[in-house]
């Protein structure tokens, strides 16, 4: 099994990258892909860059060039579920765009023409992630993760997301674009991220302060999940 891992920022991939053995670096389209073995399992780790276009471009390059069997999206996210705090884990059962609006033509809010309203994560990957969470004794929530090309740190943006997606547990800037590409390639995916902030007016300050905490927690989860998928 070869496992693809995608993070947007240097801080979100560095801990995993440093553990890859026999590492080789591939530079493509402004992205970097690191291949090798993580605890004996073949991995391809992508640093995509921030935002939906960068994530979709990177995911496509990763899938075409490295042919992973599954994709894990890692990194940080803003918490929406009331029980979440910094360092907690969120696992997607679905991903949707929070900034797409073609409702004038009868589509659901967040749905693009020719696409499902949401992109479902793989049940086996979700189950494996939840098993890792239990083994690591981490606090976690599973549910809808929404994505858009905006960092949410104000009441207006937050209120709009809560209105359109009251069930959403977290918000970030890449996951749904990655899920969209995986859907088109028919490759199973799951989003496993750690909370760096709660999406409020102080979220930009919290993000800067706690990004390292979120990166450490999400990397710990991904390393455990890779081991679980490879060896059970």
UniProtKB/Swiss-Prot annotation:
GO terms for cellular component: cytosol. Pathway: Amino-acid biosynthesis; L-methionine biosynthesis via salvage pathway; S-methyl-5-thio-alpha-D-ribose 1-phosphate from S-methyl-5'-thioadenosine (hydrolase route): step 1/2. Changing residue 9 to A: 13-19% of wild-type catalytic efficiency. Its EC number is 3.2.2.9. Substrate binds at residues 78, 152, 173-174. The active site is at residues 12, 197. Changing residue 50 to A: 12-23% of wild-type catalytic efficiency. Changing residue 76 to A: 13-23% of wild-type catalytic efficiency. Exhibits activity across a broad pH range. Enzyme activity is moderately improved under acidic conditions. InterPro entries: MTA_SAH_Nsdase (IPR010049), Nucleoside_phosphorylase_d (IPR000845), Nucleoside_phosphorylase_sf (IPR035994). Optimum temperature is 37-45 degrees Celsius. Rapidly inactivated after exposure for 10 minutes at 55 degrees Celsius. It is an enzyme of class 3 (hydrolase). SUPFAM superfamilies: Purine and uridine phosphorylases. Changing residue 193 to A: 13-28% of wild-type catalytic efficiency. Disruption phenotype: Cells lacking this gene are deficient in biotin synthase (BioB) activity in vivo due to accumulation of 5'-deoxyadenosine. Disulfide bonds: none annotated. Changing residue 151 to A: 0.5% of wild-type catalytic efficiency. Strongly inhibited by aryl-substituted MTA analogs, alkyl-substituted MTA analogs, 5'-methylthioformycin, 5'-chloroformycin, S-formycinylhomocysteine, 5'-methylthiotubercidin, S-tubercidinylhomocysteine and S-8-aza-adenosylhomocysteine. Poorly inhibited by 5'-isobutylthioinosine, 5'-n-butylthioinosine, 5'-methylthio-3-deaza-adenosine, 5'-isobutylthio-3-deaza-adenosine, S-n-6-methyl-3-deaza-adenosylhomocysteine, S-adenosylhomocysteine sulphoxide and Sinefungin. GO terms for biological process: L-methionine salvage from methylthioadenosine; L-methionine salvage from S-adenosylmethionine; purine deoxyribonucleoside catabolic process; toxic metabolite repair. GO terms for molecular function: adenosylhomocysteine nucleosidase activity; identical protein binding; methylthioadenosine nucleosidase activity; protein homodimerization activity. It catalyses: S-adenosyl-L-homocysteine + H2O = S-(5-deoxy-D-ribos-5-yl)-L-homocysteine + adenine; S-methyl-5'-thioadenosine + H2O = 5-(methylsulfanyl)-D-ribose + adenine; 5'-deoxyadenosine + H2O = 5-deoxy-D-ribose + adenine. Gene3D superfamilies: Nucleoside phosphorylase domain. Belongs to the PNP/UDP phosphorylase family. MtnN subfamily. Catalyzes the irreversible cleavage of the glycosidic bond in both 5'-methylthioadenosine (MTA) and S-adenosylhomocysteine (SAH/AdoHcy) to adenine and the corresponding thioribose, 5'-methylthioribose and S-ribosylhomocysteine, respectively. Also cleaves 5'-deoxyadenosine, a toxic by-product of radical S-adenosylmethionine (SAM) enzymes, into 5-deoxyribose and adenine. Thus, is required for in vivo function of the radical SAM enzymes biotin synthase and lipoic acid synthase, that are inhibited by 5'-deoxyadenosine accumulation. This is 5'-methylthioadenosine/S-adenosylhomocysteine nucleosidase. The gene is mtnN.
């Amino acid at each position: 099994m070869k496992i693809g891992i995608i993070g947007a920022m240097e801080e979100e991939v560095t801990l995993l990258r440093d553990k890859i053995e026999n590492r080789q670096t591939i530079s493509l389209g402004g992205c970097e892909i690191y291949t090798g073995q993580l605890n004996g399992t073949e991995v391809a780790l992508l640093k995509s860059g921030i935002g939906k276009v960068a994530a979709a471009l990177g995911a496509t390059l990763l899938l075409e060039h490295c042919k992973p069997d599954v994709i894990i999206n890692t990194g940080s996210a803003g918490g929406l579920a009331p029980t979440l705090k910094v360092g907690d884990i969120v696992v997607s059962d679905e991903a949707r765009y929070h900034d797409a609006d073609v409702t004038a033509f009868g589509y659901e809010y967040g749905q693009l023409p020719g696409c499902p309203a949401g992109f479902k994560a793989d049940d086996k990957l979700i189950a494996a992630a939840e098993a890792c969470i239990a083994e690591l004794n981490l606090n976690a929530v599973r549910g809808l993760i929404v994505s858009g090309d905006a960092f949410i740190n104000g009441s207006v943006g937050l209120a709009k997301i809560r209105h359109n997606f009251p069930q959403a547990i977290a918000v970030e800037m890449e996951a749904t674009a990655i899920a969209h590409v995986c859907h088109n390639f028919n490759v199973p995916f799951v989003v496993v991220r750690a909370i760096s902030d709660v999406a409020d007016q102080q979220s930009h300050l919290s993000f800067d302060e706690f990004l390292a905490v979120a990166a450490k927690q999400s990397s710990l989860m991904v390393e455990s999940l890779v081991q679980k998928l490879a060896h059970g």
